[in-house]
Regions:
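N-terminal-biased segments
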Residues: 1, 11-14, 48-56, 174
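Substrate-gripping "pore-loop 1 plus following alpha2 helix"
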Residues: 22-27, 149
């Protein structure tokens, strides 16, 4: 039997239900266990940050994960790396948000909460995906790196943000969008390379 590499997304693949109230069916856990028993390589591949995905990884019995939209790698339960977004492009976007009155927040670290300069982000979104912590006078330049930026607006308002075109982004909720890496294949290839696998598998 040829060893195969299986990568599973969390949202909408392993986890069912609405964000913030998701669960993983027992049948899914059993199927993953059977793949491992048969000698196949299994890993999570998610757009979620490491901090927002690691509990799912552990509860499902995974040891390996591609996180942060392809920019994070965990091997044998050890976080190897998370590459942040382009710092200057994030600052440019936040500056434009301030200038044009867009509500914004950031994830400057690997934690299960985002930072916002005031309560407007939560007031606008009522988001349950992750906690929003208010840091009065939040200045993104006080942080060395930025992993995600969040912009609260309804589509197609984001088209007014010229600097958004320079960054990868997606919309999972009608109230706000995520500026985050979106090419999980980058992390998947890094993982297959690490284990000296073949991409065809």
């Amino acid at each position: 039997m040829n060893k195969k590499f299986f990568f599973f997304d969390i949202d909408g693949t392993l986890a069912v239900g609405t964000p913030g109230r998701q669960y993983i069916p027992e049948s899914t856990k059993k199927a993953i266990h059977l793949l491992k028993e048969q000698g196949h390589f299994v890993a999570i591949a998610t757009g979620r940050s490491y901090a927002m995905a690691v509990d799912h990884m552990r509860s499902l019995g995974f040891e390996n994960m591609v996180s942060d939209g392809g920019n994070g790698i965990t091997i044998d339960n050890e976080l190897i790396t998370i590459k942040p977004l382009d710092y200057q492009k994030c600052l440019n976007l936040i500056d434009e948000c301030k200038e044009k009155g867009f509500i914004w927040a950031i994830s400057p670290d690997n934690k299960t909460r985002r930072l916002a300069p005031d309560s407007r982000f939560y007031d606008f979104t009522h988001d349950v995906y992750m906690d929003t912590e208010v840091v009065e006078g939040l200045d993104p330049r006080n942080y060395d790196q930025i992993f995600k930026v969040y912009v609260a607006c309804f589509a197609p308002e984001e088209q007014k943000l010229e600097t958004l075109k320079e960054l990868p982004w997606c919309r999972f909720h009608k109230e706000y969008l995520f500026v985050e890496p979106g090419d999980k294949s980058v992390g998947i290839k890094m993982m297959v390379d690490h284990f000296k696998g073949d991409y065809k598998d």
